[in-house]
Swiss-Prot record:
It comes from Danio rerio. Residues 34-79, 94-148 are annotated as: Disordered. The keyword Nucleus applies. Residues 101-110 have a biased composition (Polar residues). Residues 147-223 form the RRM domain. The gene is rbfox1l. Pfam families: Fox-1_C, RRM_1. Expressed during muscle development in adaxial cells, somites, cardiac precursors, finbuds and jaw muscle cells. This is RNA binding protein fox-1 homolog 1-like. The record marks 148, 156-157, 181, 186, 190, 214, 224 as: Interaction with RNA. The lineage of its organism: Eukaryota, Metazoa, Chordata, Craniata, Vertebrata. GO terms for cellular component: cytoplasm; nucleus. CDD domains: RRM_FOX1_like. It is found in: Nucleus. Residues 49-65 have a biased composition (Pro residues).
Length: 382
């Protein structure tokens, strides 16, 4: 007999406190009624381990504890309490079906849905009803919506009353319009019906008919897409040269126009049209005219463009007297020592850098080539 209670763990992990046989002779595990293990001759000693439970082999479902749990069926409640041992188990029962009462109760939630036994007939009836409703809406919209027809290739003598009389037999016409220009009718027009159905009927009847030897065409009028044309920018003949900054560098001849709106720099105004030529670059004119900037003078100009380049003027051809050249100021003419073009290198004075070349009227191509081959070059470094 044990002197103190001993805690024994079963395979399920629940502690079991063994008691002596004198206290609970019929409840203690491992009593004399059970199988005695080896060395279990004393009936007062408890059975230490219970027999291991049996597990199903792999791949099979575990057996249902039919002997311990009641069947879970949706049957009526058990008023007699057959399962007294399982008083904590709640048995759920399904709803009671009593014929027409359940149908009436279910229809209270959806009272608008038709009650039919055939779902196919239900879908057909609903579809036919919606189709009828859609057709009525479409028909009503067609009657209320006006429609415009485009009539082309009509006789040129036709006027609005003639076109109204031709289409008025098919329905009420809201508007008739024939397009005209300064020479008369353009041969087409528009007819607006109050109803789209009447417009379609008129289009089917009159399209392709012969009226006074002309086959008219009647079609549905479509909205014209109106596109706004871009505004043409204000440019002159020179295009991009209208900018005063760009024109001063690349097109100084624009500043010789008397009506040009932009202000003209003082050196350019003083030596406009003078003999100080420099391939049309404003930088040369500014440098060469710096000495006479203090005494500017007005420059008479022709009504047209006074050319800055000698290649553009009449002096490019050579042999013309000075009276036929571009008008220039007195101050500019006094200091003019360079040629108007490439044909005459020196016109009024000698070159201070080369004393062997004297004043001359013009040089030919051969003479110019010989001068350059002979060492004449103002920009030579030595």
């Amino acid at each position: 007999m044990l002197s103190s209670p001993t805690v024994i763990l079963q395979p399920y992990g629940l502690p079991v406190y063994p008691q002596t046989a004198s206290c609970y002779p019929g409840i203690v595990q491992g009593a004399a009624a059970q199988e005695a293990g080896p060395g279990n001759g004393d009936p007062s000693l408890p059975q230490v381990y219970a027999p291991p439970p049996s597990y199903p082999p792999p791949g099979q479902a575990p057996p249902t504890p039919a002997a311990r749990l009641p069947p879970l069926d949706f049957s009526a409640a058990h008023p007699n309490s057959e399962y007294a041992d399982h008083h904590q188990l709640r048995v759920y029962q399904g709803p009671q079906h009593d014929g027409t009462e359940s149908i009436t109760a279910s229809n209270t939630d959806d009272s608008l849905a038709p009650v039919t036994s055939d779902p196919q007939s239900l879908s057909v009836s609903v579809a036919s009803g919606s189709g009828a409703a859609g057709g009525s809406d479409e028909e009503g919209g067609g009657k209320a919506q006006p429609k415009r027809l485009h009539v082309s290739n009509i006789p040129f003598r036709f006027r609005d009353p003639d076109l109204r009389q031709m289409f008025g037999q098919f329905g009420k016409i809201l508007d008739v319009e024939i397009i005209f220009n300064e020479r008369g009718s353009k041969g087409f027009g528009f007819v607006t019906f109050e109803s789209a159905v009447e417009a379609d009927r008129a289009r089917e009847k009159l399209n392709g008919t012969i009226v006074e030897g002309r086959k008219i065409e009647v079609n549905n009028a479509t909205a014209r897409v109106v596109t706004k044309k871009p505004q043409t920018p204000l440019v002159n003949a020179a295009g991009w040269k209208i900018n005063p900054v760009m024109g001063a560098m690349y097109a100084p001849e624009l500043y010789t126009v008397a009506s040009f709106p932009y202000p003209v720099p003082t050196p350019t105004l003083a030596y406009r049209g003078s003999g100080l030529r420099g391939r049309g670059r404003a930088v040369y004119n500014t440098i060469r005219s710096a000495a006479a900037a203090a005494t500017p003078a007005a420059v008479p100009a022709y009504p047209g463009v006074v050319y800055q380049e000698g290649l553009y003027g009449a002096e490019v051809y050579g042999g013309y007297p000075a009276t036929y050249r571009v008008a220039q100021s007195a101050s500019a003419a006094a200091t003019a020592t360079y040629s108007d073009g490439y044909g005459r290198v020196y016109a009024t004075a000698t070159d201070p850098y080369h004393h062997s070349v004297g004043p001359t009227t013009t040089y030919g191509v051969g003479t110019m080539a010989s001068l350059y081959r002979g060492g004449y070059n103002r920009f030579t470094p030595y």
